[in-house]
Amino acid sequence: MNNNKRSKLSTVPSSRPIRVGFVGLTSGKSWVAKTHFLAIQQLSSQFQIVALYNPTLKSSLQTIEQLQLKHATGFDSLESFAQYKDIDMIVVSVKVPEHYEVVKNILEHSSQNLNLRYLYVEWALAASVQQAEELYSISQQRANLQTIICLQGRKSPYIVRAKELISEGCIGDINSIEISGNGGWYGYERPMRSPEYLYDIESGVNLISNSFGHTIDVLQYITGSYFQKINAMISNNIPTQFLLDENGKRTKETISKTCPDHLLFQGILENGKVPVSCSFKGGTPVKKLTKNLVIDIHGTKGDLKIEGDAGFVEISNLVLYFYGIKNGNGSSNGTDNNGAAAIKDKEKVTKSPSPSTGTSEEEQTMEVFHLRNYNSVVGNILRIYESIADYHFLGKPESKSSRGPDDLFASTKFDKQGFRFEGFPTFKDAIILHRLIDAVFRSDKEEKTLDVSKIMI
């Protein structure tokens, strides 16, 4: 199996590109300019930016000029923007606390815009599970509107490769999983220019919703299983942080934060009753040899380890280590979506057969999987756009989950990605993750283990 191949849409489509309208795109060093915009530039035959909305018309027009968007129209009215007939897809990339109002207004004002087919929103869908549920409910009333959520970690070539190895039985049945991560600026220091909402528990952006949220979504995706029950302990042991100057040096100035800086999480996966233990803390490792992210997956016939330099799996250029059973169909083509060469160091293990597994020497293999020159910040998001293009120009994928039957597709919409290799995460995938994160906070507050087997839609 090779799911790390290029998009099926390898040639320029005969019909016009998907016309994209952006909410929040500005020039400079903004997140959307460094990610979504660069991704679309690489897929110019499939996507074309035709509209921009920003709070002021001046900002929209300046961005159009600076980014040389010759086909784009600027807007300062969200209502007019949502009703613009020349838009096929709207991409929302603003601060998470603004998602609810922006997305709700788009859904309401675009109700008569039959040309609008796609609504793509950055994670998190909203600042709270209640807001997210409402947005999902409204979107479900739009029969011809396809939703997309930016859980781009699922598209990481390392995550896809790990999912392949597990689904092909290369490590046997999973016995246990351990995760440890460091969530960047949630420790003792933070940059002076870092936005304050990132440290406000009410904003919906924090160590748990962001670092843990993306990671646990990827874990469920890799293993093909949601959680059955979970238990969590949350701490804010660093309520005051030192500010760093523009050179990264600590100043004497301090500032308060209300979001957590530590999470202890335990859970049991539904499939195989696999125990999962997870620890996330704020800050970077004290020891330089300690990785910011480590995921260890232990099986009856082998092991997987995923390591990253940042505690954000969705934007980290990872390394995948594999020891287990060689599957003839599981080899990768050795290239990423941009044709970059892959480092795949393989070694036959000279080891006696294991008495516990009965594995012979010839069947065992080791692999280190890493992609040279792969930019995970842009590349993972680009792969979501490729999946959207495949869906738009070639039709919805028909494959099933790699682990058992999955929900049937709706007649016209891609309902949810679930655990499929193909497709893209939707608002339904977002709601499932929002509910799990909400359960994590409730478990800590109620000081008990919670049954989360009913959170799926």
Swiss-Prot record:
The keyword Nucleus does not apply. One of its GO terms (molecular function) is DNA binding. GO terms for biological process: galactose metabolic process. Keywords: Carbohydrate metabolism, DNA-binding, Galactose metabolism, Repressor, Transcription, Transcription regulation. InterPro entries: Gal80p-like_C (IPR055080), Gfo/Idh/MocA-like_OxRdtase_N (IPR000683), Gfo/Idh/MocA_oxidoreduct (IPR051317), NAD(P)-bd_dom_sf (IPR036291). Residues 333-364 are annotated as: Disordered. The keyword Nuclease does not apply. This protein is a negative regulator for the gene expression of the lactose/galactose metabolic genes. It seems to block activation by the transcriptional activator LAC9 in the absence of an inducing sugar. To yeast GAL80. This is Galactose/lactose metabolism regulatory protein GAL80.
